[in-house]
Amino acid sequence: DAKILNSHKDLHICARDTKSLDYLKNALSCNLLLVPDMAFCISQKTLDRYKQKETDKALFLKRNDQELCEYDFSLYIAEKVEQLHIGDWPTMEKEFKTKVYLDKLVFRRKRLKRIPDIYADLIFRPFQVRKGIEFVSKYRKVYTTRLHVAILSVLLDKEIIFFDNSYGKNRSFYETWLKDVEKLKFVQ
């Protein structure tokens, strides 16, 4: 509720695109900041550590949920089928078993309630970053409907075709942060 948020004396809210920032400006009177997505904080050292040898194949990383916006993707994909890997994030296609197990646990004792957060910070998030870099870095060109794949592809200096999602999140982020990236083409 905006009234509750506005009553806070020192509240700072970060938005990752100008559309979200404008919405917040109309609803709130707190400190608002426009900041890029945290994925841009992946260090060059981390990218170099997990980067794989690039092949001549292209990747079409296509989400399979309610955010997917249907396009005639064939109008934008130049590669032949044998030169194209089509799929979603490896961690989205096959959930990380330990995460699923921990998600089902109910921590009743106060001291144990932080275990899922500690696990996410120390194990699961670094695992996802590593897997993402290893996966995306193998391809010379990336077609994607996922924002974080586009960001990772920018960090890896890939040629990118970036498709909007069902409610314009990708377009808003592109217009705020990615429109000047030479190797990136956006499809609305």
State where each predicted segment sits:
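Active-site anion-handling motifs in enzyme catalytic cores
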Residues: 1-188
